[in-house]
Curated annotation (Swiss-Prot):
Pfam families: SiaC
UniProt protein name: Uncharacterized protein PA14_02130
Keyword Signal: no
Presence of the UniProt keyword Phosphoprotein in the record: yes
Length: 126
């Protein structure tokens, strides 16, 4: 299958899906005009990856801000991971944030409450 490369802009995160490594990373702000257009292709990539065997999938996030529609899209992605995890698939998420940005830490905590798969929240001095 293929990798996913979506360049970041002022209002959208840079998104890389590495099929071989089993890693999806996102970094930057997320307040796109059309979050479905942006995240639809990410959700498709995750669905294809999860349908192809049993290899682990790791999400690595460095998201600074998410608007409401981006939060909804992220919830859809996490639901896919949770379903895969419940089916025995190894999945994990690591959310990095600037320790000065407590809002992002709180958002990550809220997401983690709904997930039973490994979900690390790591503070950094940016």
């Amino acid at each position: 299958m293929s990798d996913l490369h979506i360049p970041g802009t002022q209002s959208t995160p840079a998104i890389q899906g590495d099929w071989q490594a089993g890693r999806l990373s996102m970094q930057g702000d997320s307040y796109p005009e059309n979050s479905y257009e942006l995240f639809g292709q990410v959700i498709d990539w995750v669905e294809r990856f999860l349908a192809d065997g049993q290899r682990p999938l790791e999400l690595d996030l460095r998201l600074l801000y998410l608007n409401t529609s981006s939060i909804k899209a992220m919830m859809d992605i996490l639901d896919l991971l949770e379903e895969a995890h419940q089916g025995g698939r190894p999945v994990s998420l690591r959310w990095h944030y600037d320790r000065r940005n407590e809002r992002v830490a709180e958002l990550a905590e809220e997401f983690r409450e709904d997930c039973s798969f490994p979900f690390a929240i790591q503070a950094h001095d940016e």
